[in-house]
Amino acid sequence: MGQKIHPLGFRLGFIQEHYSHWFAKANSYSELLQEDKEIRSCIYNHIRNHVRNSSNYGGIARINIYRRTDLVQLQIHTGFPALLIENRIRGLEHLRRDIQEKIDHKKRKLRMTLVEVLKPYTEPTILAEYIALQLENRVAFRRVMKKAIQLAKISDIKGIKIQIAGRLNGAEIARNEWIQKGRLPLQMLRANIHYCHYPAHTIYGVLGIKVWIFREKII
């Protein structure tokens, strides 16, 4: 039976980096790790409640967290920064207040910056969120997968694979369907492969979405 390894964890320390960049003492490590999780959840919940709707999706590719003794610095990599900037009341200022409440008990400062992703559809997280939004709007899954591949291929990637699992089109029995275009060398460490799994909440239940994107080979 084949054993599958996480594509990002497999390359961590070689061509992939951690999303949290800090050191801590052993007695406070777990607390800071939990705080990182809460900060990321706060950002994603804000996007889901105040930015995302039937036609817009958040477009968050990743969130990097840097820490100093009295400073927490967030880098939010997004393909569509205008969605967060255009409405200041519900946008960055509201998000900043929510995050500050989570770290205020340590009297630390918060610095938050937006980094624009120039080719958003080369990011599997953004592509998976697009697929989830379409599935939640009851678009046929095969049409969604083909459209997602078209969006990704415009950005000159080497290969892509999309898998959707669950009660597809409301079927009684759950199954998984996938489509692949181009190369996807999962066992090559030098292959710059990005991966994401994302849930889609439909009226028939939760569908699981997985996206693999092969950008280039690192020499």
From Swiss-Prot:
One Pfam family recorded for the sequence: Ribosomal_S3_C
One GO biological process term: translation
SUPFAM superfamilies documented for this protein: Prokaryotic type KH domain (KH-domain type II) (SSF54814), Ribosomal protein S3 C-terminal domain (SSF54821)
GO terms for MF: rRNA binding; structural constituent of ribosome
Record's subcellular location: Plastid, Chloroplast
InterPro entries for the chain: KH_dom-like_a/b (IPR015946), KH_dom_type_2 (IPR004044), KH_sf_prok-type (IPR009019), Ribosomal_S3_C_sf (IPR036419), Ribosomal_uS3_bac-typ (IPR005704), Ribosomal_uS3_C (IPR001351)
The organism's place on the tree of life at top rank: Eukaryota
GO CC terms of this entry: chloroplast; cytosolic small ribosomal subunit
Keyword field: Chloroplast, Plastid, Ribonucleoprotein, Ribosomal protein, RNA-binding, rRNA-binding
UniProt keyword Signal, yes or no: no
Signal peptide span: none
KH type-2 domain ranges (all copies): 47-118
Keyword Coiled coil: no
Intrachain disulfide bonds: none
Protein family according to the UniProt entry: Belongs to the universal ribosomal protein uS3 family.
Self-association and partners: Part of the 30S ribosomal subunit.
This protein's name: Small ribosomal subunit protein uS3c
Source species: Chara vulgaris (Common stonewort)
Classification of source organism: Eukaryota, Viridiplantae, Streptophyta, Charophyceae, Charales
The encoding gene: rps3
